[in-house]
């Protein structure tokens, strides 16, 4: 029921003056306008909330409708004829002749993967079968590492560039000389000497796709999984030629074969045989270069070391004094280092240390400066970092010995 004028409570007394009544009415009008504006804002918020829930309802309804649809089956096109397409279902291997729309026929070819419904009609074409794990190994953006970031490995880096980079940038040079470019390079040496760093640097200097994986990722529990992943890996490389395939810790799948009858060892050997087949099988590898790295060269099977698979066997040793000095300068070029720091003396005092150890010393020296509330790294910080690195390595060595004789 609508209030009448008599029902409305006035904001003033009847005895009030005309001026007081006018001021009271103006004050009430201002209050009502504020309340009206607030209610309008709340209405807009409510409408926005309603639209959001309406969109969510439509999305859930669409998803619910999709979930109620019958699943599609996977099949492979065996042959295209005038009557349609001959397909073979995955799983039961049953073959069938089915109709194909003109739009799909234009893109299909023998070997294409398709999705079919209950009546075996081709609904859509699927991507080529390649293991998802192999696809995620591809690195689209080249690693942000340059040759100037590597110190003490000039000879090794030159050989790697001749094997990987030169055939991609100037293939005509090899044709003129009349030789085939080396197809693979194996980097071996102690941990932390820069094997992976060299592979990243070469990839960053070429326009090739860089595909990196660890050998341990190829070791799987079920029969045939590792070999299938190797095939898929090289198929991805062929699809993205030119390509550089980097296999780290290759000793995980290429160790010396034994007479062991366990299923795990047999699966590893099957994976290695597939790798050998891909490296020098009947199918040409095309413009694909392989870089592998290991710190257990003594464990590798002789079959994988012969020429034609890895044409370059490059040892990556600990850097010498000059190499360590260059590595010190590389890792400190962005640091605020005091003028009194003698990198030549530091290099001479850090014998038999790897490039990774030198980097750890530089980082730890910076931490010592921060601990003393300084922004400048001094010679004493590097010396203290070296002592700390020696102390940290001694318990680890003792633990390894105790585990060996436990």
Swiss-Prot record:
Protein's gene: pan1
Keywords attached to this entry: ATP-binding, Chaperone, Coiled coil, Cytoplasm, Nucleotide-binding, Proteasome
Gene3D superfamilies the UniProt entry points to: 1.10.8.60, Nucleic acid-binding proteins, P-loop containing nucleotide triphosphate hydrolases
Name of the protein in its database record: Proteasome-activating nucleotidase 1
Biased composition (Acidic residues): 1-12
GO CC entries: cytoplasm; proteasome regulatory particle, base subcomplex; proteasome-activating nucleotidase complex
Pfam families the UniProt entry points to: AAA, AAA_lid_3, Prot_ATP_ID_OB_C
GO molecular function: ATP binding; ATP hydrolysis activity; proteasome-activating activity
Domain notes: Consists of three main regions, an N-terminal coiled-coil domain that may assist in substrate recognition, an interdomain involved in PAN hexamerization, and a C-terminal ATPase domain of the AAA type.
Organism: Halobacterium salinarum (strain ATCC 700922 / JCM 11081 / NRC-1) (Halobacterium halobium)
Segments for region (Disordered): 1-20, 385-406
Location(s), subcellular: Cytoplasm
Subunit structure comment from the entry: Homohexamer. The hexameric complex has a two-ring architecture resembling a top hat that caps the 20S proteasome core at one or both ends. Upon ATP-binding, the C-terminus of PAN interacts with the alpha-rings of the proteasome core by binding to the intersubunit pockets.
The keyword NAD appears for this protein: no
Residues reported to bind ATP: 192-197, 331
Region (Docks into pockets in the proteasome alpha-ring to cause gate opening): 404-406
Coiled-coil portions: 12-70
Function: ATPase which is responsible for recognizing, binding, unfolding and translocation of substrate proteins into the archaeal 20S proteasome core particle. Is essential for opening the gate of the 20S proteasome via an interaction with its C-terminus, thereby allowing substrate entry and access to the site of proteolysis. Thus, the C-termini of the proteasomal ATPase function like a 'key in a lock' to induce gate opening and therefore regulate proteolysis.
Family membership: Belongs to the AAA ATPase family.
